[in-house]
Every structure is written in structure tokens, then in C-alpha cells.
Amino acid sequence: AKDGDFEGPPGCLKMGELCKGGTCCTKVYKYWKWRKLECLGKNDGWFKKKFICDEPCNPXX
């Protein structure tokens, strides 16, 4: 595998993509290892949330 490779169902959403109602890929290969992807709610301005595919517990996040 190489950086940027994804695993998951066909047409799955990649890291950083908005995932409200969509399906994130299950894994992304980043920094020499497979990492889990989930649809996570991030604060987006005041009292708003956006849901993006990201690695759980990713501080940059």
C-alpha cells in the first residue's frame, strides 16, 4: 500500500470529505500504516457542526 490508498465499499468517501448521509471508506493508508476512518462531527463556526470522514482521535482535525 502507499499513502493515499483507501479501503472500503465502492464509491466510499475519502478522508476530509463531507459525510452527512454518506459512507466513509473504512481505512486510509497514511504515514506508513492503515488508519481507521469514521464520519465525525466537527465544530464549524458558531453552534454548527459539519460531518467529515476523519481518523478518530485525530488532533488535527
Curated annotation (Swiss-Prot):
Disulfide bonds join C12-C25, C19-C39, C24-C53. One of its GO terms (cellular component) is extracellular region. InterPro entries: Beta/Mu-DGTX-Dc1. It is found in: Secreted. Expressed by the venom gland. Keywords: Disulfide bond, Ion channel impairing toxin, Knottin, Neurotoxin, Presynaptic neurotoxin, Secreted, Toxin, Voltage-gated sodium channel impairing toxin. The presence of a 'disulfide through disulfide knot' structurally defines this protein as a knottin. Belongs to the neurotoxin 26 (DTX) family. Acts by delaying the inactivation of presynaptic voltage-sensitive sodium channels (Nav). Acts against insects and causes a progressive spastic paralysis. This is Mu-diguetoxin-Dc1c. It comes from Diguetia canities (Desert bush spider).
